[in-house]
Structures are given as structure tokens and as C-alpha cells.
Amino acid sequence: LSLLGFEPNEDFEHLVKESRGRRLSQASPDSSLLLTKSINATPHGGGQRMKMNSQEYRIMRRWIEQGMMPGKADDPRVVEIKVVPEQRRMRPASEQQIAVIALYSDGQQQDVTAAVQFESNDTEMADVTKRGIVSIKSLAGEVAVMARFQGQVALFRASVPILEGENQWPEPTNPIDAAVIAQLKSLNIPISNVCDDNTFLRRVTLDLTGQLPTLAEIKQFGSNPSAGKRSEWIEYLLSSENYAEHFANKWMLILRNRRDTPGQKAGSFAFHRWIREQIANNRPFDEFVRDIVAASGAIDVHPPVVWYRQVADTFSRLEDTSQLFLGQRIQCARCHHHPFEKWAQKDYFQMASFFSQVKTKPGQSPDETIVFTSMGAPRASHPKTGESLKPAGLDGPVIEDSDRRDPREALVDWMVDKQNRFFAKSISNRYWKHFMGRGLVEPEDDMRVTNPPSNPELLDALADQLTHSNYDLKALIRSICNSRVYQLDTEPNGENLRDRKCNSRHYPKRLGAEEILDSVDQFTATSTAFDSMPANTRAAALPDSSFRSYFLTVFGRPEGTTACECERSNESTLAQSLHFANSKELIAKLGEANALPQILSKSTSSHGENIGEVYLRAFSRLPSENELQSALAYIDKKENKQEAYQDLVWAILNCKEFLFNH
């Protein structure tokens, strides 16, 4: 049967006519396989789906008994469902019965609660029964319950405040803080204090450049008496080469910049260089996207053509474009109605027709690809109806003039139109997750009505800022990094310990694989060699995803085979712990002649000063008194001071504080 019954006409053919109608018996309805399997009287893989004499059973039995008639074309159809109530403020450990009303094409309304599928978007906050009873647990926050019936979806939203205590919140001075603080007030969740300067310095430097602050930068920042020195530091980082390198790496991987043959090296290197230049020059994001999606010509003339080498067919081009730049995972609609969204196959193939005229041909070398658009009207054929479909954006009008120009240009025009919220919300959410560790929508590229943002007002504010700045990514970054919310401490203050998505405090996040390797090299004063790359090349500066490194692999660097950032793993694993504890690679780094342990063992500074330098290099802070005395005691009792410093550096590398941005 079709997924969730989205293709009733096909289901009717299978049930009633296929295999000589053996699944149904009008003469003996109760012996019909459809019913005996549903109640598990006839064993099958699906198990029991209903009970005998239940409402569902009686409806199906009556239909069989009455002759299994198909529906008529003019039968009333469900055009919308509504949840009652739509939202409610609830206490912890409380319940709410929700009802679902179906609105039909002939104007009638019907309570369909008993036939609806319900699903909670956060089972740690709330569960929901098959009959629509929502059970709130003990966590404060906001939770949504999805209701789905005959291709329609609706949401019930519950806000669960903390009941005890009277909290104080600062006055917001920008739209980001205003949206977050308003939500925290409504939920009575206290907000943490702003972090200290050293924490901010390490956090923002890692987030913007992917590397630790240097000793010189720590001194430069610390000696700045200006009240606005945090904003000044953000500007300093945004103008650095490491900023462009770090974000070029981010985009290079999800744009699938990889090489499958040695001959593709020049193209992948050129594409990376192009991405890096666009970021360094702060190219408006809409123009950046246009150059990729509408790329034509040869790689040496227009490097974004490389993207078409990996997305080699119409479907992958459509799906990557939707996921990367619109936050829409539309893949499901290729074969059937999307189970969690309103997109039908027609929506999918109307989008696909934008790419229907894209062709490729070999260039001067076997590994070179030339992309061009052939003449003719862009069309896609609906796989079930055979209808010839003109290009149209999701929820957008049919593009009538797409046969008079490159249809992809028309697609980008629709995408970047400021009235089209998909584009601005998608990139805003993606960048929010980069800095805050969690998207307002999770996963960050799966934005749909059944996966609502944790703070809709904040997502709107970010998208508004982006469109008003004409898609200026540096302006978006400035807004986020200068906000009080970004600069909050990770330390909870009682009741916000369990908050995971309201941004009442900063959430620590494990560094990415490239950040960890680059931080190890920077901290230990060593470097990692990569095949065919110049000495001292950072992992974040590798031009494509095809460089082999066990370290990067074990810490979750993606191979660039999909457009999904979920290909990257930032989870901590046993293999990572073992690698840090026993890796010959790390041990060799600590033993290099010019590595940090050797520098410190030969230093004329006191051991206390050396220990302070170690902590500054790793954590951008001086050691606490306990940390200092513990390290001094160890170094004093060790005869071989070089080994003592090797042990100290090794111990720091194995600290969670080193591996996390906090």
C-alpha cells in the first residue's frame, strides 16, 4: 500500500483487483485477508494493527460488505485540518486532550481525532497517545505535537513554564536578545550571566576562524581598555584570512567538493579557491548561490561548474539546491507525497523542470566537464499522470517565461526574492547553529511545518536582518556574535540547567575534526603534513574532502558525499579517546625537537610561568591555584623536565575543556 495512504486510487487497485481480488471477500467480510491480517488472526510482518470490532474494523468491514466501491471524483475531500486548542500554557506533569477537526471541500466539518496520527517533536518534554492526549513531563520549554490526517498536517503547541521563583532578565538592546528574552520571560526560565573576557575570546575566535587565540592575540585583546573591545575583536576576526579559510571549509564540504580521479584535482582546488575568495570578499549570499546554481561553461573559466560534477542528474541537483539553500528535504516527494510536509510529487517535478535543460559535455581533458543549457521549453513529466509540468518554485507560481532564458536563472530569482522566506530562514538557521551549537530548527536543513522552530520570532528576526542587509553574511555574523545571548556563560544558574533549546545559557559544543587537529598543532607548536600540500597547511585549508587522514576521519570529518551537514559527526566516541591516549601520531608530535614541551624545558622562565603559558595556549586563561600547584608538584618531582612537560601537554590535550568550545 502507498505510504500513509497518499495514493488511494493505487491502493484500491491493489486491494480489490490485484491477485484476482483474493485479499477481500464480500460474501464473507470477516475472512478477508485485509481484516484477518490487521487483527493478526493471520500472522504477518506488520503484527496487530487494530482490534476486532474496533471502529476501524467496523468501517472496513462495512465497506467490504457493501461491495468495495471506489470513491467518486466529486466526493468531498479534506482540504484542511485544525487542532483544538492550537496552543496552551501547561503545567509540568499535566495532560491536555486535543481534538482534530477536518474541513471538507463541500464545507462540512467532522471530528476525526480517533483517526488521526499524532507525534510529539520532543518526547523528553511530552508524549501523546493515539487518541490525542498530550502528557507533559517535567521539563520547561516549548513542545509541539503533530497531527496528520489524509495528507493534511496541523500542530498543537504547548508552553511549559517553570512555576517556582521570580527571575530578573536584562533589557534587550537588539532583536536577537529581544526574541530570546521574551521567550525566557514567558517560560520563567532564568538567564545565565555574560561570560568573562577570556571565555569570549576563545569562543569567538574558534567559531570565526577555527583556531585558538595565539599568545599575542590574548595579550592584544586583554590589554584593550575599550568598552567595545568585544565588537572590535569580532571585526578583527572577520577581516582575517583564517575566517575565510574556516567558512570556505564549511561550504566546500556541503557543496560536495571532492575528486574521484586524480585528473579532477585542478577543478576541486579551483572551486575551493573560488569559495574562499567569495567569503573573503563578503560576496552577498544571493549572488554566491546564483553563481553556483546557474553555473555554466568550463571549470577553468567558472569554477562553480565543479558542483555539477558531483550532482550529476536532475534529481540530485534539485534535491541539493532545496536542502542547501531552502532548508527543504524534498527527496521524499520524488516517489510519493511527502509524509511530513505538504509537498506532492507535482511540487517535486515542477522544481525539477528548472534543471531539465542542463546538459554536460567533455572538455579538453577526460576529467573536465562543460555545463550548458540546451534550447527548448523546460518541462518535467509527472511519473504517475504523465502531465507535462512547467517550472514552479515551492508554493510559487508557474514561471511562464522560463523557455526564453536559462530556467535556472528564473529559479534563483524566485529563491532569493525577499518575499520568499525559505531562503533567508534557511541560511539564518544554518549560521545560528554554527555559532550556538543548535539550530532553531533541527536538523538545520529540515524546515517544515511539522518541525517548527524553537523560537519562531527569533528566526523571523534573523531572516529579516539578512534580507534587509541584502544577504550580507558578515552582518548576520556580527548580529549573532555581538548579542548578549551569544556571549552568555555556559554555567547554568539553577533552573536553566535542563534548558536545551531556549538559549538561556551558551551550550558547549565539541570542536569539529579540523578544528581539533589544527588546535593540536597550534597548541603543541607542530604541524601535520598532507599529501601534495605546502608545509604548515591547516586542516581547515584543505581544498577538498579527498585528503586522507585517520585523525580527521576518527573525529568525524565528512567525505563530502552529500549536501547534509549531518554527514559530519561531532559526537565523542571511544575511538577518539583511545586515539588521544595512545596515538603514535600525537606522541611523535610531543617529541619533536621544536615542539612545545621542548621549548618549555629549555625556557629560562619559571615553571609557574611555563604552566601559565600552557593554559593560555590551550584555554586562553591562566590556571586556577589548584591547577597550578598540581602541575608544579608533578614537574618538581620529575627529574627529566622535558618528559614532565610532555606529560603536562599530553594531559591538557586529553581534557574535555580542550576539545570543546564553551
Which ranges hold each PLM region?
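Long, His/Glu/Asp-enriched segments that create or flank divalent metal/ion-associated functional microenvironments
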Residues: T524-A541, S545, F551-A581
